């Protein structure tokens, strides 16, 4: 027998075809060569003559391919009578693949071998079974943990959103859960405690009336002005200016104020009467001309001038009449004289009255003769607003008359009267369901669209009056189901790209959804669609309505009694959300109407004041910046404060002031950023008007019926900013909000020059200038601002007292008699 130690005696070939050799020095197989061949049983053939071969693929890979033989040799090591016999394999096993490290789920359930082939293994193919693989437990746990983590983040975001919508007890429980605190624990709410409810600057005393508004005819005519009104802001400025003067007289108190980091502390109680700070003209009576002929008309040329002035300057902002139909009726009326309905004549006379106001401003004609707007008002009054007609039920034309009367009073700065007639138009419209979707198949599409635009015109006017007066509004996004107006003119309703919006209500509700109610995805889709519409008055009307809904929501949610009862953190969350809505609206403004450049909201108007769509750009810009400063006004109180300083507002209790010291750095940064935005928005609004005052330009290029409101809103915001300025600015980065004093004072002087110029023509502007001029001259000396170039106002005409209402004698006896009469009548 040959020596078997030289080569493997079976001649087994490896995978590459070469004979498999065994290293004699390998300790793992050394036992094979050391066997005692002579001691074997004679009946067993020598190993070299075994007609067996090892399989090419083993079931279990190991450090040595002949594991079964080695195992057998170990078993025989204790008994020389046994020889290791390799396992017999069939020819088919030569091509069998080794078992997969991870079986598919069907093979694992049936407990059979799986080759691990993907996407389908061999066993599943043979058994016609759907093959799929499941991750190992460790991977499954990791994925499940990731999914649970994302769900927790979603739930936390949802709870944060719900926190500002629920009542205070539920909000407190939500905050404790988010902080990981036991909700049943009675512990304090930390730095965000209930004491910080009143910490938003201008929202204190929101639910209070600090004077008797029924004490005289003048106070009754003036009415109430709420916290979001610039009249209330002016009242606060007057009280602070008086406080500053008192400190100036008392040097000790003044030094204490400087040492405390503030220039003044507001008085503990309102000192100035509301009627004294209102620059509107509700205390001036409206003459009733009983001698006017309600059926008389101005000369045709003058009538055309008034009619065109209204249609060009006012109708794009208030689509109160269906333009194509009314223009056709107007032409027919003058070409073929007939007796139209009284309410149609009343609408025409109110259009003449408003157009006459526009013509007076642009032509400089005195308000006399056919240029007297009061004549047209009295004609409309006799036709539809007499004692008998007022008790009749209102139809669409009566709603239009009431609306136009309210708008006329706005242009006359008779805000309280406008508020009354606007409420009448609103109630009449709701009584006819104009605030709801109109789906009557018998009514033509243009007529349906006219009702939609009438409703949104009422909404716009009601919103404007709410912004001016600060009173509770009748309108809100939850009241109306009417879709946004279509951004196309009536002449384009038959086009293939426009007609589906009229025919498919679901498409219209999806495409023309309010920005206030849109999700992020819907807003981004709108950004690409709306700018594709061609510029037109209807597109402008669509944009201004969409913006007004956001601003009205700001007034309803922030400047509300509900907002007063909420925590400062909840109010701040609302401000963040509405700020995002305004950003989204700005991103959707079509290119023809854009008034900003880049991604920010910095004003960037064309240098050519006669550029196309310039009036629309300026009107949208003024409305946008007015919305911005209204939103951020509650944070303006913090501009003069260093981090950690207590709030200077008198309504804040000591416990709230202690809580304000615990305000986080992020909240202070938020307040500062919002205050900066408020001041910048006010300055941008004033930048919309040129440096040189021009009444004609102001009337033709701006919303002239409420331009005084915009100018005073921006001016009062800047004056509030200046009044909260410390006399010595600390070197603190948080005070960068007040760093540009030169630009701020420059815009203030510009506003005063405009008010002074307007004061020669408008009594309301005259009152506004005198109020602002008085406050500026009292607060600027301590700030080192030179006001020598501001007109003094001594050259202005005196107040016209011809129609002023007299004040009732405020003695106890007269008041007792007056109140006794009120109780019985």
UniProtKB/Swiss-Prot annotation:
It comes from the Eukaryota. Disruption phenotype: Leads to increased production of ochratoxin A (OTA) in the presence of OTA-inducing carbon sources such as sucrose, glucose and arabinose. Increases the amount of superoxide anion and H(2)O(2), as well as the sensitivity to H(2)O(2), in the presence of sucrose, glucose or arabinose. Residues 239-251 have a biased composition (Basic and acidic residues). PROSITE patterns: ZN2_CY6_FUNGAL_1, ZN2_CY6_FUNGAL_2. GO terms for biological process: DNA-templated transcription; positive regulation of metabolic process. Induction: Expression is down-regulated in the presence of ochratoxin A-inducing carbon sources such as sucrose, glucose and arabinose. Its main location: nucleus. InterPro entries: Trans_reg_galc (IPR053230), Transcription_factor_dom_fun (IPR007219), Zn2-C6_fun-type_DNA-bd_sf (IPR036864), Zn2Cys6_DnaBD (IPR001138). GO terms for molecular function: DNA binding; DNA-binding transcription factor activity, RNA polymerase II-specific; zinc ion binding. It is found in: Nucleus. Signal peptide: none annotated. Residues 68-79 have a biased composition (Low complexity). Keywords: DNA-binding, Metal-binding, Nucleus, Transcription, Transcription regulation, Zinc. CDD domains: fungal_TF_MHR, GAL4. GO terms for cellular component: nucleus. Residues 104-131 bind DNA. Residues 60-102, 239-267, 642-663, 804-825 are annotated as: Disordered. Transcription factor that negatively regulates the biosynthesis of ochratoxin A (OTA), a mycotoxin composed of a chlorinated type I polyketide dihydroisocoumarin moiety linked to L-phenylalanine, and demonstrated to have nephrotoxic, immunotoxic, genotoxic, neurotoxic, and teratogenic properties. Also regulates cellular redox homeostasis and sensitivity to H(2)O(2). Carbon sources such as sucrose, glucose and arabinose repress gal4, leading to up-regulation of OTA biosynthetic genes and altered cellular redox homeostasis. This is Transcription regulator galc. It comes from Aspergillus niger (strain ATCC MYA-4892 / CBS 513.88 / FGSC A1513). The lineage of its organism: Eukaryota, Fungi, Dikarya, Ascomycota, Pezizomycotina.
